[in-house]
Every structure is written in structure tokens, then in C-alpha cells.
Amino acid sequence: ASNGNQPAGVQFDFTATDPNQPLGDTAISGRISPQLVGMGLLDLIPEANIIGAADPDDNNKNDISGRVHWVQDGKQQRIGRFGWKAINSSLRTQNANAMSQDMGLTTSVFMDPNCTANQPICWTAPNGGTPEVSDSSLDAVTDFMTALAVPERRVADLSTFNKGAQLFTQVGCASCHTPKQKTGASVRFPLL
């Protein structure tokens, strides 16, 4: 069970009374919105940095087996970085996937409507053309997402922050979740 308050003060509750109960025709699930700030910086981390930090066989004997998550991107394998379970290799692909899965819009990346084989009405429904979102619009959204800056750190008590950072390293989180990265060059956003 999970419960809490939305900013407007509206109470919400999710309770699984019987997790083995079959789902009905319609199923819903709670979602946590992904963090959007700083995604442009993550997109610019060179693949070599991520591959270099991987240790799938625990060669350094620290009991952590960090792995690179590879995804199919067109005809090539790339590192998954964005979306649930890191299923998208770039911020542009993540945005196109969100337009397809969350909004039902086609792009040059995802040309087919978000319909299953069992939804013939969905496949024949009117739409805004193919693709519905132009490459220039997809690129504009990607540029906007790339430029969303990480806010300044707001820490009232720096000693508490430093203790948290120290614990993050001590328990081994920093072995996979590298605290500092250097971005690669960006032609569109050279200041990143």
C-alpha cells in the first residue's frame, strides 16, 4: 500500500488487497514521473565512460557487478540511458517513445500507432498523418529537454549533505552510480 498527498492536498491511496487476484478488463498503476532536469547532460556522457565503469564479472572483487544495458537502436546496439528500465539510447528516442506510448503520436522514430493486434478500431482511427510529429518538432522538444538545467543545490545543512555523500560511497553505490562524469562535446549545446 502507498499513500500520500499531492501538492494541491488531494489524498490518494493505492492498496493491493490481493496481489494474486486476476486483473479485470482495465488495469491501472501508479507512476512516478521521471526527473527531467539534467537529461541533456546524461545524454552527453560518452559511451566509453559508461563501458569503462562496467564490471559485470566483479573483477575488482567489490561484490558489485555493474553492467551496461544494451538496447537495439535502429540497426545498431547502443547503451540504454533513458525511460523505464533504460530502454531508450538517446534523449531524442526517449522523447519519441513518450510521444508514442504516453500521447499516442507517431514520429519518424515510431511510425506505427500505439495499437495492439487486437485493436482493429485503433489501427483505423483518424490520426494527424504519418508521422503526426515532424522531425523539427521532435528536435525542438529534444533541444528543450537537453537545455533543462539542474537547479542549484539547496542544502540547509552542508554537514548532513556531506555525510550522505560519504555514506553513498561507503556502502558501494558510487561503484556503479558514478558521482561525477565529464560530458562529451556538443555541437548544438557547446556550453554543456
Predicted regions, residues:
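Periplasmic c-type cytochrome electron-transfer domains
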Residues: 1-192
